[in-house]
Amino acid sequence: MASSTMALSSTAFAGKAVNVPSSSFGEARVTMRKTAAKAKPAAASGSPWYGPDRVLYLGPLSGEPPSYLTGEFPGDYGWDTAGLSADPETFAKNRELEVIHCRWAMLGALGCVFPELLARNGVKFGEAVWFKAGSQIFSEGGLDYLGNPSLIHAQSILAIWACQVVLMGAVEGYRIAGGPLGEVVDPLYPGGSFDPLGLADDPEAFGELKVKELKKGRLAMLSMFGFFVQAIVTGKGPLENLADHIADPVNNNAWAYATNFVPGK
């Protein structure tokens, strides 16, 4: 009897129907099913970014974090004064929104700075300042991508909009749906084709990369907000504003502009 019980508990029979001879259990039939626990985010063991002993937002001066912020997810510094993460479903949605916005902000910040950097080093663009570049599509000659007429030559804002919707919608749909075979478990970190360098192969390194992504992404979102404010206030790109500040920091800073700014002038 004991040996039969031990044999039935073996993982080799997980998920299979096991017929036991009637000589052992009468006319009994035992069905065993494998149940998988819900996967939890992997955290790097001994990492300072995860768990109850993780780094908090004010270091040793931080108060007790809310009970629902356990350090299970990357970027959790125990700070949620507004209680935005108290509801698990809202927390999951906000986590996804933050990661996606972080990635867009990092790409956006690079796209704002890099063309202006190239233009300041002799590369010819029709317009290198990020918030002015798009308006070139309304010019007589249209907009040449990278200033090269042999690349994409855009003359219709509606066509550009349609292409963006189709292309980005396809990529996002692919990510959210889990790929063509639905093999992606976590749409935030799909891996596979989205990780050609295999950066997620090591769980501990992957856990640290998640934290780095969020930290840099949060800075990028603040940077993009600053770029928008600069564009409204000074009408210049981020690198030109930086050059002006270095040349005359007393008269070219946020405080000076705030005290002298008159909207519409």
From Swiss-Prot:
Ligand binding (chlorophyll a 5): K212, Q230
Amino acids binding chlorophyll b 4: Q164, R175
GO BP annotation list: photosynthesis, light harvesting in photosystem I; response to light stimulus
SUPFAM superfamilies cross-referenced by the UniProt entry: Chlorophyll a-b binding protein (SSF103511)
Binding site for chlorophyll a 1: W79, S85, E98, R218
Modified residues (Phosphothreonine): T35
Compartment list: Plastid, Chloroplast thylakoid membrane
Residues that bind chlorophyll b 2: R103, I152, L181
Free-text remark on how the cofactor is bound: Binds at least 14 chlorophylls (8 Chl-a and 6 Chl-b) and carotenoids such as lutein and neoxanthin.
Binding site for chlorophyll b 1: Y57
Major localization class: plastid
Binding residues for chlorophyll a 2: H101
Residues annotated as binding chlorophyll b 3: S156, E172
Binding site for chlorophyll a 6: H245, A254
Topological type in the membrane: Multi-pass membrane protein
Stated role: The light-harvesting complex (LHC) functions as a light receptor, it captures and delivers excitation energy to photosystems with which it is closely associated.
Assembly with partners or alone: The LHC complex consists of chlorophyll a-b binding proteins.
Name of the protein in question: Chlorophyll a-b binding protein, chloroplastic
Organism annotation: Zea mays
